[in-house]
């Protein structure tokens, strides 16, 4: 999860500055649209996990996040920025929920608490290191390249999910 929250940290920290450099005005709407996507997905993701399995719901979430980062990197106007926010919120809402489910699925029942604790350590480390890494990248290469490079972490998360899931048909 740390690889995912690393990108989230960059999005939440630097979208206002990025939008300002693009002359897009009030980027606060980005976060409203992000929250709408997040809430919509979270309202239905539990049922989707039960019906289709964790992997079948995690992968589309990660694809949404990847698409959002691409749109964000190349945004030239507010509607594209807002679409990116919706996709990122939707993807993050799904990815966080499904990855937390995966962390528990890989643990024996007496270790569910430890699995959740470890999950959130990764979550918090991603946020902390993400802002630091994103700041360094944006200073060196600019916001657009920063968002493009951070896609690598979504790809790494995807590879790890595929590598360490209990089975392709796993459900909780």
Predicted regions and their residues:
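Residue-level signature of mid-helix packing/kink "hotspots" within the transmembrane helices
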Residues: 35-43, 127-128
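Helix-to-loop junctions at the C-terminal end of transmembrane segments
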Residues: 41-54, 138-139
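Helix-loop junctions at membrane interfaces in 12-TM secondary transporters
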Residues: 73-84
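A membrane-interface helix-boundary motif in multi-pass transporters
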Residues: 136-154
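Structural signature of the two symmetry-related core transmembrane helices
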Residues: 56-71, 148-151
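Loop-to-transmembrane helix entry/capping segments in MFS-fold secondary transporters
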Residues: 109-119
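Extracytoplasmic gate region of multi-pass secondary transporters
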Residues: 1-32, 38
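Intracellular juxtamembrane helix-capping segments at the cytosolic ends
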Residues: 94-107
């Amino acid at each position: 999860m740390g690889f995912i929250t690393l990108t989230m940290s960059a999005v939440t920290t630097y979208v206002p500055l990025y939008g300002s450099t693009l002359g897009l005005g009030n980027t606060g709407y980005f976060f409203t649209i992000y929250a709408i996507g997040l809430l919509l997905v979270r309202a239905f993701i539990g049922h989707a996990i039960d019906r289709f399995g964790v992997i079948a719901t995690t992968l589309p979430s990660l694809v949404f996040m990847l698409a959002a980062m691409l749109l964000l990197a190349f945004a030239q106007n507010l509607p594209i920025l807002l679409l990116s926010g919706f996709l990122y919120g939707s993807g993050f809402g799904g990815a966080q929920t499904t990855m937390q489910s995966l962390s528990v699925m890989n643990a024996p029942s007496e270790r569910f608490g430890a699995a959740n604790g470890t999950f959130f350590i990764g979550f918090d480390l991603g946020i902390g290191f993400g802002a630091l890494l994103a700041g360094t990248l944006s200073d060196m290469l600019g916001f657009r390249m920063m968002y493009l490079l951070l896609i690598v972490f979504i790809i790494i998360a995807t590879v790890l999910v595929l590598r360490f899931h209990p089975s392709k048909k796993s459900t909780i």
